[in-house]
Structure formats: C-alpha cells, structure tokens
C-alpha cells in the first residue's frame, strides 16, 4: 500500500527526488496514526489525532520535505510535531545523518510523538520538545531548514532569526480566506518568498 501511494505521488510530480521517495517508503505511516485509522494510513488524506490536531496528508509531507532540499548532515527544526510522522520522514530524508528537532505546543501530543519516535528507532536523530514553536528553539539554532506544519497569520520573526544564511523556511500563511504555502529563503538580512500552492492546515496555536 505504501509503495502504491509513493508511486502515485511520484507520478504526480510531488515526490521529485530518490531521497524523499526512499524516506516516504521507509517510514510506516500506520505507526503514527490513531489505532482506529490504521486501515486508512495509506490514503492520501490528513487524519485526526487528538486535541484538534491532525497528521498531514502524505502528499503534503512529501512536498514540504522536498522543499527543504534534504541532504545528509542537515539540522532541521519542525514546528508542530503532531504524531511525529513528518519528523521521521525528514530523518530518513537526511539518511539519519544530521538532526531533526521538533517542537509541539500540546504536551500530550509531544509525549505521544516522543513515544512513537523512540519505539520506531528514531530517538537520537529526532529530538521532541514541548513548547511554543513560534519562538523556535534558540538553544539549537541556527538551522538549515525549518518546517511549520500549522498556518501562521504572519511569518514568525524568531524563526527567520534562527535560520542559517541560505536556510529555508517552509510555512503556510493565512491570506484572506485561504492559506498559501511559502518557501522562504534567508539571504543575509533579506528574505526571498516563493508561493508554492494553496493549502489547508490547522492554525498555529499560541502558548
């Protein structure tokens, strides 16, 4: 089932690189969904977790992962851990060589994600934190890439500060009645914004 889904995403041009393709095949999505949704794990759709959180649709996980151009040795920050699935995919995409830090504002979700990450052997490559992701994770900055899995009203300035020069922020931003996914590249004191597509994410929560 995973292979069929990944082949579909590859044929649709969402998965572009062999690295992301291998990562999507390596991570068992059924281990990151609630038990009652395991049979739906390889449908290309978001699925409910708890506390109004969701696990993103596979196409969105793959797209965001491709946008940060993963490579071995990268240091990635994820804002909005959810169940830990995106963090695990990122860990595989950097070939488990580097570090993925992920921060979740809902304590119960952070605990759930940490349990998933540890059970599946990603602990040490992935570190899970409980806190306000809009503030980033300054103690581990700067980052090569930051992925935000919830929609912000504006680009959080702290996240830009915590990017390396040339680093990439992938984030959905609320615009009018919708949301737009942006790839933002830091160039010295300036940023380059590129709109990718319209999306639908849960809102980025305040602490």
From Swiss-Prot:
One Pfam family recorded for the sequence: PCMT
Catalyzed chemical reaction(s): [protein]-L-isoaspartate + S-adenosyl-L-methionine = [protein]-L-isoaspartate alpha-methyl ester + S-adenosyl-L-homocysteine
GO MF annotation list: protein-L-isoaspartate (D-aspartate) O-methyltransferase activity
A Gene Ontology BP annotation from the UniProt entry: methylation
Matching CDD domains: AdoMet_MTases
EC number in record: 2.1.1.77
Record keyword Chaperone present: no
Organism superkingdom: Archaea
Subcellular location: Cytoplasm
PROSITE patterns found in the cross-reference section: PCMT
Family per record: Belongs to the methyltransferase superfamily. L-isoaspartyl/D-aspartyl protein methyltransferase family.
Record's function text: Catalyzes the methyl esterification of L-isoaspartyl residues in peptides and proteins that result from spontaneous decomposition of normal L-aspartyl and L-asparaginyl residues. It plays a role in the repair and/or degradation of damaged proteins.
Protein name according to UniProt: Protein-L-isoaspartate O-methyltransferase
Gene name as annotated: pcm
